[in-house]
Amino acid sequence: RSHEWEYVGTVNELAVARSRNTHAVYYGPNGWASLVGLWWLKSGVTTIGADLENTIALPKDRAPKNLGSVLLFNDSASFTAAAGVKVYTDTAMQEPVDQIKLHSDLEPKATVLRSGPFVISYIVREDRRQFKHALRIKDTLSAARMAPPLRYFPVDIKWRVQARYVPVAGADSLPIIGVLGTETHMAHPGDLRFTIDGKKYSLMVIREPEDHTNDLFVMFTDSTNRKESYPATRYAWVSPPDSLGRTVIDFNKAFNPPCAFTKFATCPFPPKGNHLPLYVTAGEWNPHYEADAKQDATRTTPK
């Protein structure tokens, strides 16, 4: 029993730390909630600024009439600052840039442009075996950054589940649909098999292209997705298995994807088959769900 209380205390401490960290990641000046747009680029020139004639129009009270432009040509992008506008990069914060080649978030050193409260990133996403290019723009003064603290289901050691990792024979990939309807093929190195309340379950492990760790990543849905947890998906990281394939899935550490906090994220959704037909009353709560005092008292309610 003391072991259980020690575990609960440890996870609660992690939840507090994660809440602080996640609040910064999602609601900080450069967090996901500060995103004000995601614009897919076409070949040619895309202009940015407060003037409504620009391809991308920014708030008039915080942006210059013309901030700059992006040229996309042969799957390569470059940025040119408008005359008199100071634009900086993370690697050259002391001197403004006039023109610069853009490196995407799929590259080791992605380009991040900053001008006033605006932060501009260049991203590339696979869609049905082709690549699409886009700009993400954050506004560090966005009102969307104001949000309540994260909430969690009460920690329950029941949801710390022993699992066995079963590798997939040969190379395998799965078509993964994203929140914006894009289709990406991601590696499927193996499955996690486990038992809850005497019933057997399995989750497919997914490896994203930019993931260079040995940890296992799963995306899943369950019956709480209707209300208590975020409807689209939850994510969980799992420690690497031992030599016998043994590991632990701790659903108390399940967390929401970025798209739970902004409509401008490109979150992947779980593959078909990663739905658990039970109420996983553990992990992070749906940030948009307000508890109803009259809800079914037979289910655990987040506090």
Segments from the language model and where they lie:
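C-terminal boundary/linker segments immediately following FHA domains
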Residues: 1-6, 11, 82-83, 88-162, ...
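Conserved, compact domain cores that house catalytic/ligand-binding motifs in diverse enzymes
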Residues: 145-210
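Beta-strand-rich interaction surfaces with strong enrichment in secreted/lumenal proteins
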Residues: 99-100, 110, 191, 234-240
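Mid-length scaffold segments of soluble, non-membrane domains
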Residues: 47, 60-64, 69-80, 183-230
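Forkhead-associated
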Residues: 9, 35, 40-108
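N-terminal pre-domain segments of enzymes
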Residues: 1-39
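Extended, aromatic/histidine-rich regions of cofactor-dependent oxidoreductases associated
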Residues: 148, 225, 237, 246-248, ...
